[in-house]
């Protein structure tokens, strides 16, 4: 084998690896998109069927089950929210911190999600949310409306985002900046309807 052949071979291998990484990323995004759309469609059909739980007898879904749909029109975001914060949950949806209340209950409902360019990119545009933007939470019984009242960045070990409150509050949090994840972006919203 001569040097010229080896250089060509190494070049072809590098191109193949680059294409593999690119196609893998595209494949992950496509799979996540269709999974999200299917989950939202099924949940909306469930709500429309009238088989949802009643306000009087609320049964909180088990870990991994659908809790609600979170909509933020100002950033064109509509995403499923499942119970729990396990890696498998956050790769395909947002996650509800089960140590906090569910939407519509008095207290602090905390929902977390990833910001990434591959898997779990549900909160990629969360940093574009502004004070007074509306956030909608669709549950099997009703839609809750919240208005953004506070936007802040905290340290990763700051657990104050989980603190209970004496009002109906929605707290969204995610890593920031994208990929570096040195801090947490926190969006706080209060129920308006």
Language-model segment annotations:
Residues 1-7:
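Short, Lys/Arg-rich N-terminal segment immediately upstream of the first membrane anchor
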Residues 8-193:
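Solvent-exposed, non-transmembrane regions of membrane-associated and secreted proteins
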